[in-house]
Amino acid sequence: MKADIHPQYHLIKVVMTDGTEFQTRSTYGEEGATLNLDIDPKTHPAWTGGTQQLLDRGGRLSRFNSRFGNLSFGKK
């Protein structure tokens, strides 16, 4: 393998949406950094079987709905 081409791999703390914390190794941030999750396996509809909840981050969802909310895509 070539030297000095791979990102640093170190321990970080991951905080899930319910406050549960665990440590894992990652290339994210620096040693000891904290990664706060917005969506995790306990809340994601693909894993829970629930309906999808859309979070409006920075008004993007509102802007999309204002531009394309009146389209029907074949629904009558």
Swiss-Prot record:
It comes from the Bacteria. GO terms for biological process: translation. The keyword RNA-binding applies. GO terms for molecular function: rRNA binding; structural constituent of ribosome. Keywords: Ribonucleoprotein, Ribosomal protein, RNA-binding, rRNA-binding. SUPFAM superfamilies: L28p-like. One of its GO terms (cellular component) is ribonucleoprotein complex. PROSITE patterns: RIBOSOMAL_L31. Pfam families: Ribosomal_L31. Belongs to the bacterial ribosomal protein bL31 family. Type A subfamily. Binds the 23S rRNA. Part of the 50S ribosomal subunit. This is Large ribosomal subunit protein bL31. It comes from Beijerinckia indica subsp. indica (strain ATCC 9039 / DSM 1715 / NCIMB 8712).
